[in-house]
Amino acid sequence: MYMLYLNSDQFAEALERIDTVVLPIGMTEAHGHHCPLGTDVIIPRRFLELIEERMGDELIIAP
């Protein structure tokens, strides 16, 4: 569950039942002319989306 999409009430409720918050981080840098600058940010976010699909609402993905 992406924290960015929750309102403050939903976030407070989620924190009462979820004990895992993950912060995907990465550098913004060039990886050649063929890759986007955000490659190191895009990959961890996608990885967490796949984990979320398996875990359901058992983790919060922080911005």
Identify the role of each PLM range.
Residues 2-63:
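N-terminal catalytic or cofactor-binding beta/alpha core of small enzyme domains
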